UniProtKB/Swiss-Prot annotation:
The modification Phosphoserine is found at residues 444, 453, 1160. Residues 1348-1358, 1404-1416 have a biased composition (Basic and acidic residues). Changing residue 985 to D: Loss of enzymatic activity. This is Neuropathy target esterase sws. Isoform A and isoform B are expressed in the entire brain cortex; cortical cell bodies of adult brain. Sws and Pka-C3 are colocalized in all neurons. Its EC number is 3.1.1.5. The keyword Nucleus does not apply. It holds the Pfam family cNMP_binding. Residues 56-1425 are cytoplasmic. Its main location: endoplasmic reticulum. CDD domains: CAP_ED (cd00038), Pat_PNPLA6_PNPLA7 (cd07225). Residues 367-381, 1337-1347, 1380-1403 have a biased composition (Low complexity). A nucleoside 3',5'-cyclic phosphate 3 binds at residues 598-727.
Amino acid sequence: MDVLEMLRASASGSYNTIFSDAWCQYVSKQITATVYMYFALVMMSLLFIAWFLYFKRMARLRLRDEIARSISTVTNSSGDMRGLRFRKRDKMLFYGRRMLRKMKNVSGQMYSSGKGYKRRAVMRFARRILQLRRDNMPLEMRTVEPPAEYLEETIEGSDRVPPDALYMLQSIRIFGHFEKPVFLRLCKHTQLLELMAGDYLFKITDPDDSVYIVQSGMINVYISNADGSTLSLKTVRKGESVTSLLSFIDVLSGNPSYYKTVTAKAIEKSVVIRLPMQAFEEVFQDNPDVMIRVIQVIMIRLQRVLFTALRNYLGLNAELVQNHMRYKSVSTMSGPINSQTSQSSRQAPNGPPMVISQMNLMQSAVSGTGSSGVSVTVTRPPSSPSRHSREEHTLSDPNPNPDGSFHGTTNLFTEVHGDAPNADLFHQQQQQHSVGNLSTRRSSITLMAPDGSHSCLQTPGVTTSIDMRLVQSSAVDSLRKELGLSEEDSHIIEPFVELRELEPNVTLITEGNADDVCVWFVMTGTLAVYQSNQDATRAKQDKSDMLIHFVHPGEIVGGLAMLTGEASAYTIRSRSITRIAFIRRAAIYQIMRQRPRIVLDLGNGVVRRLSPLVRQCDYALDWIFLESGRAVYRQDESSDSTYIVLSGRMRSVITHPGGKKEIVGEYGKGDLVGIVEMITETSRTTTVMAVRDSELAKLPEGLFNAIKLRYPIVVTKLISFLSHRFLGSMQTRSGSGAPGAPVEANPVTHKYSTVALVPITDEVPMTPFTYELYHSLCAIGPVLRLTSDVVRKQLGSNIFEAANEYRLTSWLAQQEDRNIITLYQCDSSLSAWTQRCMRQADVILIVGLGDRSHLVGKFEREIDRLAMRTQKELVLLYPEASNAKPANTLSWLNARPWVTKHHHVLCVKRIFTRKSQYRINDLYSRVLLSEPNMHSDFSRLARWLTGNSIGLVLGGGGARGAAHIGMLKAIQEAGIPVDMVGGVSIGALMGALWCSERNITTVTQKAREWSKKMTKWFLQLLDLTYPITSMFSGREFNKTIHDTFGDVSIEDLWIPYFTLTTDITASCHRIHTNGSLWRYVRSSMSLSGYMPPLCDPKDGHLLLDGGYVNNLPADVMHNLGAAHIIAIDVGSQDDTDLTNYGDDLSGWWLLYKKWNPFTSPVKVPDLPDIQSRLAYVSCVRQLEEVKNSDYCEYIRPPIDKYKTLAFGSFDEIRDVGYVFGKNYFESMAKAGRLGRFNQWFNKEPPKRVNHASLNEYTFIDLAQIVCRLPETYAVNTAELFSEDEDCDGYISEPTTLNTDRRRIQVSRAGNSLSFSETEMDSDVELDLKLERKTDKSTQSSPPSNSRSDMRGKEEARHMSNWHWGVKHKDETGSGATEATKTQTGQEQELQQEQQDQGATAEQLVDKDKEENKENRSSPNNETKN
């Protein structure tokens, strides 16, 4: 009341201004009237309540008086009733009815009638009068903190293992898996060395023949430069080792080396375990398979760790290989030629002359060397003049073409007659080297020129047939020496040596090819080795390959790919006219069976080619294996190294001062971890731990410094890398980590390499679901689907045993490297395969049926226990026929607090059709040939898993938001899928409509109806209230939004959705991804002054329009995982052309300028405009960052002429947005900029090609090949997916051999398919059906062709069986007889088919069927699968 007295005093004359007195009087009257009005309203309400209670009490008294009068009347009329009594049954009836009346009153409180109903009606009326509304709050999502294991590392001690044995076990793990007896034998050779501070562990000129493991203390490893200075490479701490794997190969191959530049000195008192490398040689004599596996692991480490780190991240290519090696004299390798041969016409442009003197020929003939029985016919056509005019290729200009490409190059193994790429000499001659005739082949060799004519060593125009036995003998002798074989072993390699003469620029093998791997030996000429350019800064300018080194005569190449079993890391081409001798991969493996030690010589050949830099790096680089939960480094530790993720997944967690832990990011395969902290020399800011079993390469800081001093290009590479990372962090900094932001708002990489698929119940159609997801992923890139049956077929039935751990993990790692994503389909039980899937998965998809119970099963809880740190996402399936929308999603999420994200997937009818496994494979073999629907939920899920999601951001702007509907229609017509939607203000409304309906017609209709309601002014007038907080109460506005959406939660939307609001309680923005949809849409549309802030149901914070802080939240969408974003801005444009009025401003002057028509108008903002500009200051800054970002396509339709409240022009504004959007996307398509949004559109259907098959490129275990380890299934690599690839299901589904097909068909003859059949049987029967069709279609061709084709297939099949190892002996000894019978039966079958030359393909199949029926009837003839 002090204010009222002050105003009354001012009205009485304290102020002399008329205007002030009038204003004060008016205000005092209004306040007085308001107080009186509210007082009168309260008094009238109290009087009404008192009158109502009085009336109710009087009615009750009148009723009681009437009952009393009735009783008295009955008493008077009946006389004295004291002698009367009730019968027992009447008493029971009376008390029973009385009890029922009581119970009815109690139960009636649950309904809208009964006791208390009138009281509730009065309370509702009073609440409506006093604005005391209490809504029924819906079910809220329970916020459960992740378990401690999710953000904390595992700290477990190994008390049962002594420290020295534990450190040694961890150190020699880089050599592969050792069995316990082998490990114990190695431990016997260990020695303990005690060093004081300053003592040398080893120094220059000491023999490099030991592995050193630090048990305690610290050792400094440094290199000595030529000027006498030293540079530290790394500091070896407790548990780490000092060794060079390249020196390990030198010692085992009999060429021990010495330390030339590397020295190790103790920093403090230390105890070091010394393990001589000779101890391994003793073990390898008794276990040759262990030696071969160790050499293979070393070569794999060399290729994956050294080359990956130095090439991809430091930009070193040619610096890794010695280009100037010792030139070897190979005078007898070119063979005898005619004395009249013109040297000038046969001399290569850059190679040595291909001429051998007659003296060398006579000397070789007298010495008796040669290969008897081998004759070579060599012819040569006239060479073209252009061949001699070709430019010389040097290191400075390696490319023959002016544009830097190799357009004119040809492949050595391409067919000489025609251009068919699938028919090549390499694969044609594979059929000539089958297992049966490799050891006995003594055929004549014809040197063919690439143009299809015979090659000759004479003058052009002269064709002569000469004896080339000396050339063959010289090639055999040279390759024998390179492989470390004695002269007595010449007969072993002699049948496998082949000769070729190459024209310039003939490609022997391309980078990434695993089919044409050979060991090539250069006899004359030169080979050039290239590698693709990995420099990201030059990728758009220089597409040519980079020259690495030359291979001169007397040198060998191809050993690295041969030993690793992986694809070739280089492209090899002939630089000039070159003659080579080579041995194919299959032949090398057969030689290994007889002489396993050739792997040492092959490895030594690879090591000799490497530069001294690689050997120094080999001392510094470490290969680290981390189990799930183990920490790479911890927060606040010193940063002296960086790490490269080779496989697995890492998680970075920060611990705040209060002890709270938060996820900072996640790293996948190929990411660099800890590089910024190491370069800036700061302590670790986070703790990085392994989410699953991972492999890392550790690069110490000293190695970086040493390489930077020698090769300055590394600095440029690092600057480029850090610049991209810094720019990316700047773009994602805003919006992340804000209060109220979900966990997904952290900069976590949503790109996964391995995905595990787990069914909740047995009712989930897991196989069709995996097929559909596979189909959608094929449109993005190479993908692989693995099941337990597929792995058993490929690697054997005992592959899940502990003894085969190395083989299984290596095979899976290789498959993951070849594909952008690998799908692991788990079993329906907790089997060994399911546990392996959990260990391999980057993310786990828990698949359930959305219309079934949400309860958690026991199997699901076990999965969460096995993989606590792995991210888990829920996938709910809905049948398309039911037309049902997602509901009750919150119950699913509350029951599974470990789920971080959910997906709703609408499934077509074929997914839920109950079919046998065979029919499912048959169905999807046809589905795979079709184009996947890029707008389906499966494609949306596929893009999310691969990090290619497309986000749509709709900005605020009032009635101008109708343009969003037109833009949505234009986006749909342009073929752009929408995977995520976010909106603010009117954009939140339109985006929520699209996520809920996904039909442009329904969305347009609902948006139009809502806009019409906003034009009904009489409803708005009824919503007016006293303007203390806002002009409107918001009741009618809430009703319009609630009628549009209903009681739907954000979790129940088909498409992931978020909206943004301004939290004026905490002075920040809030991102809403769950909760009541209409409430948060209403909050995001609450314009200050017009609508009151909405109270957040979760914590009561006041929420206003999100446009005040971010009117176009494209940055938030990017943080949530969208890779490509379309942002549509419909906000108002502020006028920036304002009048400069000087230092002061008079309102009278503005009023004069406004009303005087003879003066020029001025542009000065008024009070509301200034308040609006102040409110949108942060929004404007955020909008400028979005416009300048590289991940966002900013679009603004021409809708500036429409006002914010022009809701009546809905159709007109929508048409403007549609026309503009259609033209905009058409122009983008013409300019080629639309590809990143619809790059899956109009793409050819995924076709299964031979090179992508599991069988044609898989992990090769040399130890298994050499030692013939037992396998259950012999996989046919030559014929798999060749004939029936168009209807055979997924490319990752290997089938069985033809003999197995026929046998399984016979065993199932006469039986119908059932739902319990396994996938293995189903694939076989499908292949049999397709094989019959293929055989029938070949009847029209000549019988000779059919016989030759079948003979070639059988030879390829036997080659494949030899390649992968034939099962000849069971582990228990019981399988030897069965395996022998199986092999004998296959040979007899092949001989019988070759004898039946007049039979057609159909007759052969029928004959095999009859023979198998007879074998089935006889127990002694059965074969074991």
